[in-house]
Regions:
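Short, flexible helix-loop junctions that flank or precede catalytic/ligand sites
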Residues: 1-261
Protein backbone atom coordinates (compact mmCIF):
# COMPACT_ATOMS: atom_id res chain seq x y z
CA UNK A 1 0.00 0.00 0.00
CA UNK A 2 1.31 3.42 -0.91
CA UNK A 3 1.77 6.09 1.68
CA UNK A 4 0.33 9.52 0.93
CA UNK A 5 3.72 11.03 0.05
CA UNK A 6 4.31 8.49 -2.71
CA UNK A 7 1.03 9.40 -4.44
CA UNK A 8 2.79 12.53 -5.71
CA UNK A 9 -0.27 14.76 -5.16
CA UNK A 10 1.82 17.94 -4.91
CA UNK A 11 2.70 19.76 -1.69
CA UNK A 12 -0.42 21.95 -1.43
CA UNK A 13 -2.83 19.09 -2.19
CA UNK A 14 -1.06 16.80 0.26
CA UNK A 15 -1.24 19.46 2.97
CA UNK A 16 -5.01 19.91 2.39
CA UNK A 17 -5.64 16.14 2.40
CA UNK A 18 -3.65 15.51 5.60
CA UNK A 19 -5.37 18.40 7.39
CA UNK A 20 -8.87 17.12 6.50
CA UNK A 21 -8.03 13.45 7.18
CA UNK A 22 -7.29 14.33 10.78
CA UNK A 23 -10.61 16.07 11.40
CA UNK A 24 -13.10 14.20 13.60
CA UNK A 25 -15.94 14.29 11.07
CA UNK A 26 -16.91 15.15 7.49
CA UNK A 27 -16.99 13.50 4.10
CA UNK A 28 -14.07 12.98 1.72
CA UNK A 29 -14.98 11.87 -1.80
CA UNK A 30 -12.64 10.53 -4.46
CA UNK A 31 -13.92 10.79 -8.00
CA UNK A 32 -12.89 9.66 -11.44
CA UNK A 33 -13.58 6.93 -13.98
CA UNK A 34 -12.80 3.23 -13.41
CA UNK A 35 -9.04 2.70 -13.45
CA UNK A 36 -8.13 6.21 -12.32
CA UNK A 37 -6.45 5.00 -9.11
CA UNK A 38 -9.23 5.91 -6.65
CA UNK A 39 -8.83 2.69 -4.63
CA UNK A 40 -5.08 3.23 -4.27
CA UNK A 41 -5.67 6.76 -2.93
CA UNK A 42 -8.41 5.50 -0.57
CA UNK A 43 -6.13 2.81 0.86
CA UNK A 44 -3.28 5.32 1.23
CA UNK A 45 -5.69 7.49 3.27
CA UNK A 46 -6.67 4.54 5.49
CA UNK A 47 -3.02 3.66 5.90
CA UNK A 48 -2.37 7.22 7.11
CA UNK A 49 -5.31 7.06 9.56
CA UNK A 50 -4.85 3.58 11.05
CA UNK A 51 -4.20 3.66 14.77
CA UNK A 52 -4.90 1.62 17.92
CA UNK A 53 -6.85 4.60 19.26
CA UNK A 54 -9.24 4.83 16.30
CA UNK A 55 -12.05 2.50 15.34
CA UNK A 56 -11.99 2.21 11.55
CA UNK A 57 -14.50 0.10 9.62
CA UNK A 58 -14.72 -0.36 5.86
CA UNK A 59 -17.37 -1.92 3.61
CA UNK A 60 -15.84 -3.07 0.33
CA UNK A 61 -16.59 -5.07 -2.80
CA UNK A 62 -13.98 -6.52 -3.28
CA UNK A 63 -11.39 -6.05 -0.52
CA UNK A 64 -8.33 -5.13 -2.59
CA UNK A 65 -5.77 -4.82 0.22
CA UNK A 66 -5.75 -5.99 3.82
CA UNK A 67 -4.94 -3.16 6.23
CA UNK A 68 -3.91 -3.80 9.84
CA UNK A 69 -6.10 -2.08 12.49
CA UNK A 70 -8.99 -1.69 10.03
CA UNK A 71 -12.09 -3.88 10.32
CA UNK A 72 -12.85 -4.70 6.67
CA UNK A 73 -16.26 -6.08 5.69
CA UNK A 74 -16.70 -7.83 2.35
CA UNK A 75 -20.04 -7.00 0.75
CA UNK A 76 -21.83 -9.95 -0.81
CA UNK A 77 -25.46 -9.57 -1.89
CA UNK A 78 -25.68 -13.32 -2.68
CA UNK A 79 -25.48 -14.15 1.01
CA UNK A 80 -27.45 -11.09 2.14
CA UNK A 81 -24.51 -8.81 3.00
CA UNK A 82 -26.21 -5.82 1.36
CA UNK A 83 -24.56 -2.43 1.12
CA UNK A 84 -27.11 -0.24 2.90
CA UNK A 85 -27.88 -2.72 5.69
CA UNK A 86 -24.12 -3.11 6.32
CA UNK A 87 -23.74 0.67 6.42
CA UNK A 88 -26.46 0.95 9.05
CA UNK A 89 -24.89 -1.88 11.07
CA UNK A 90 -21.51 -0.11 10.91
CA UNK A 91 -23.06 3.09 12.29
CA UNK A 92 -24.50 1.18 15.25
CA UNK A 93 -20.93 0.18 16.19
CA UNK A 94 -20.03 3.88 16.49
CA UNK A 95 -16.74 3.92 14.54
CA UNK A 96 -14.52 7.01 14.27
CA UNK A 97 -13.84 6.46 10.57
CA UNK A 98 -15.92 4.73 7.90
CA UNK A 99 -14.76 3.82 4.41
CA UNK A 100 -17.29 2.68 1.83
CA UNK A 101 -16.07 1.49 -1.55
CA UNK A 102 -18.58 3.50 -3.56
CA UNK A 103 -21.72 5.57 -3.04
CA UNK A 104 -24.11 3.68 -5.29
CA UNK A 105 -27.57 5.14 -4.81
CA UNK A 106 -29.69 7.77 -3.08
CA UNK A 107 -30.17 5.66 0.03
CA UNK A 108 -26.46 5.03 0.58
CA UNK A 109 -25.75 8.73 -0.04
CA UNK A 110 -28.36 9.72 2.54
CA UNK A 111 -26.84 7.37 5.15
CA UNK A 112 -23.31 8.60 4.28
CA UNK A 113 -24.25 12.29 4.59
CA UNK A 114 -25.93 11.74 7.94
CA UNK A 115 -22.94 9.72 9.20
CA UNK A 116 -20.59 12.60 8.24
CA UNK A 117 -22.75 15.01 10.22
CA UNK A 118 -22.91 12.91 13.37
CA UNK A 119 -19.27 12.71 14.38
CA UNK A 120 -17.86 10.25 11.83
CA UNK A 121 -15.21 10.81 9.18
CA UNK A 122 -16.43 9.10 6.02
CA UNK A 123 -14.39 8.27 2.90
CA UNK A 124 -15.87 7.02 -0.34
CA UNK A 125 -15.78 7.21 -4.15
CA UNK A 126 -18.06 8.44 -6.90
CA UNK A 127 -17.94 8.58 -10.71
CA UNK A 128 -17.73 12.21 -11.89
CA UNK A 129 -15.54 14.00 -14.44
CA UNK A 130 -14.05 16.58 -12.10
CA UNK A 131 -14.24 17.86 -8.53
CA UNK A 132 -16.91 20.52 -9.10
CA UNK A 133 -19.20 18.13 -11.03
CA UNK A 134 -19.45 16.15 -7.79
CA UNK A 135 -21.74 18.81 -6.30
CA UNK A 136 -24.16 18.48 -9.25
CA UNK A 137 -23.97 14.69 -9.04
CA UNK A 138 -24.92 14.73 -5.35
CA UNK A 139 -27.82 17.08 -6.10
CA UNK A 140 -28.93 14.75 -8.92
CA UNK A 141 -28.94 11.96 -6.33
CA UNK A 142 -31.56 13.96 -4.39
CA UNK A 143 -29.21 15.24 -1.68
CA UNK A 144 -30.26 18.58 -0.17
CA UNK A 145 -27.80 21.42 -0.84
CA UNK A 146 -27.62 22.39 2.86
CA UNK A 147 -26.66 18.78 3.76
CA UNK A 148 -23.95 18.69 1.07
CA UNK A 149 -22.61 22.06 2.28
CA UNK A 150 -22.44 20.88 5.90
CA UNK A 151 -21.14 17.34 5.33
CA UNK A 152 -18.71 17.57 2.40
CA UNK A 153 -15.14 18.46 3.42
CA UNK A 154 -13.02 17.52 0.41
CA UNK A 155 -13.35 16.23 -3.15
CA UNK A 156 -10.36 14.74 -4.95
CA UNK A 157 -10.82 14.17 -8.68
CA UNK A 158 -8.07 12.14 -10.30
CA UNK A 159 -6.70 10.48 -13.41
CA UNK A 160 -3.67 8.37 -14.24
CA UNK A 161 -1.44 9.43 -17.13
CA UNK A 162 1.31 7.31 -18.63
CA UNK A 163 4.71 8.36 -17.35
CA UNK A 164 7.44 9.10 -19.90
CA UNK A 165 10.28 6.58 -19.89
CA UNK A 166 13.09 8.28 -17.91
CA UNK A 167 15.76 6.53 -20.01
CA UNK A 168 14.66 7.58 -23.48
CA UNK A 169 12.30 10.58 -23.25
CA UNK A 170 13.35 13.44 -25.50
CA UNK A 171 12.66 17.16 -25.78
CA UNK A 172 9.53 17.76 -27.79
CA UNK A 173 9.94 19.07 -31.32
CA UNK A 174 6.35 20.32 -31.28
CA UNK A 175 5.49 23.90 -30.41
CA UNK A 176 2.23 24.36 -28.60
CA UNK A 177 0.54 27.72 -29.14
CA UNK A 178 -1.53 27.35 -25.94
CA UNK A 179 1.30 26.31 -23.63
CA UNK A 180 4.54 28.06 -22.83
CA UNK A 181 7.67 26.23 -21.83
CA UNK A 182 9.72 23.21 -22.77
CA UNK A 183 8.08 19.80 -22.92
CA UNK A 184 9.13 16.20 -23.51
CA UNK A 185 7.82 13.43 -25.72
CA UNK A 186 8.17 9.63 -25.90
CA UNK A 187 10.86 7.98 -28.00
CA UNK A 188 11.05 4.26 -27.12
CA UNK A 189 13.84 1.94 -25.97
CA UNK A 190 14.31 -1.65 -24.76
CA UNK A 191 13.54 -0.74 -21.14
CA UNK A 192 10.06 0.55 -22.00
CA UNK A 193 9.50 -2.10 -24.72
CA UNK A 194 9.69 0.70 -27.32
CA UNK A 195 6.49 2.32 -26.06
CA UNK A 196 8.14 5.51 -24.77
CA UNK A 197 6.28 5.18 -21.47
CA UNK A 198 7.14 3.53 -18.16
CA UNK A 199 4.62 3.40 -15.31
CA UNK A 200 1.79 5.78 -14.38
CA UNK A 201 1.61 9.19 -12.76
CA UNK A 202 -1.30 10.56 -10.75
CA UNK A 203 -2.81 13.92 -11.62
CA UNK A 204 -5.39 15.21 -9.20
CA UNK A 205 -7.38 18.24 -8.15
CA UNK A 206 -8.27 18.78 -4.49
CA UNK A 207 -11.33 20.87 -3.78
CA UNK A 208 -11.52 21.83 -0.11
CA UNK A 209 -15.03 22.86 0.91
CA UNK A 210 -14.28 25.89 3.09
CA UNK A 211 -16.82 28.27 4.65
CA UNK A 212 -17.21 30.39 1.48
CA UNK A 213 -17.71 27.40 -0.80
CA UNK A 214 -20.11 25.76 1.65
CA UNK A 215 -22.13 28.99 1.71
CA UNK A 216 -22.24 29.09 -2.13
CA UNK A 217 -23.35 25.42 -2.28
CA UNK A 218 -26.07 26.13 0.29
CA UNK A 219 -27.30 28.99 -1.94
CA UNK A 220 -27.28 26.68 -5.02
CA UNK A 221 -24.76 28.88 -6.86
CA UNK A 222 -23.75 27.61 -10.30
CA UNK A 223 -20.46 25.96 -11.26
CA UNK A 224 -18.90 29.21 -12.58
CA UNK A 225 -19.29 30.95 -9.21
CA UNK A 226 -17.98 27.88 -7.36
CA UNK A 227 -14.94 27.72 -9.66
CA UNK A 228 -14.19 31.44 -9.11
CA UNK A 229 -14.38 30.93 -5.35
CA UNK A 230 -12.20 27.81 -5.46
CA UNK A 231 -9.60 29.63 -7.59
CA UNK A 232 -9.56 32.48 -5.06
CA UNK A 233 -8.27 29.94 -2.54
CA UNK A 234 -5.62 28.54 -4.89
CA UNK A 235 -7.53 25.59 -6.39
CA UNK A 236 -5.67 23.99 -9.32
CA UNK A 237 -7.52 21.90 -11.88
CA UNK A 238 -6.36 18.45 -12.94
CA UNK A 239 -5.21 19.94 -16.23
CA UNK A 240 -3.14 22.63 -14.48
CA UNK A 241 -1.59 19.96 -12.25
CA UNK A 242 -0.87 17.83 -15.32
CA UNK A 243 0.71 20.76 -17.16
CA UNK A 244 3.07 21.23 -14.23
CA UNK A 245 4.02 17.54 -14.42
CA UNK A 246 4.48 17.77 -18.20
CA UNK A 247 6.91 20.68 -17.66
CA UNK A 248 8.79 18.51 -15.16
CA UNK A 249 9.14 15.88 -17.90
CA UNK A 250 6.97 13.29 -16.13
CA UNK A 251 4.45 13.03 -18.98
CA UNK A 252 3.84 14.48 -22.44
CA UNK A 253 1.35 17.16 -23.49
CA UNK A 254 -0.30 14.73 -25.93
CA UNK A 255 -0.81 12.15 -23.16
CA UNK A 256 -2.21 14.82 -20.85
CA UNK A 257 -4.68 16.02 -23.51
CA UNK A 258 -5.70 12.41 -24.22
CA UNK A 259 -6.56 11.77 -20.58
CA UNK A 260 -7.90 15.08 -19.28
CA UNK A 261 -9.47 17.03 -22.14
Amino acid sequence: ILDLYKLNLGNKNLEILKKILHRPNGMILLTGPTGSGKSTTLYACLNELKSIEKKIISAEDPIEYKIPLVQQILLNSKVGVEFNSVLRAILRQDPDIIMIGEIRDEESLDIALKASLTGHLLLSTLHTNDALSTIDRLLDMQAKSYLIASALSLVIAQRLVRKLCPWCKQKSKKHYIEFEGEFFEPKGCERCHHSGFFGRELIAECLEINEDLACAIRENQDKTILMELAKKYGFQTMFEQGLKKAKEGLTSIDELLRVVR
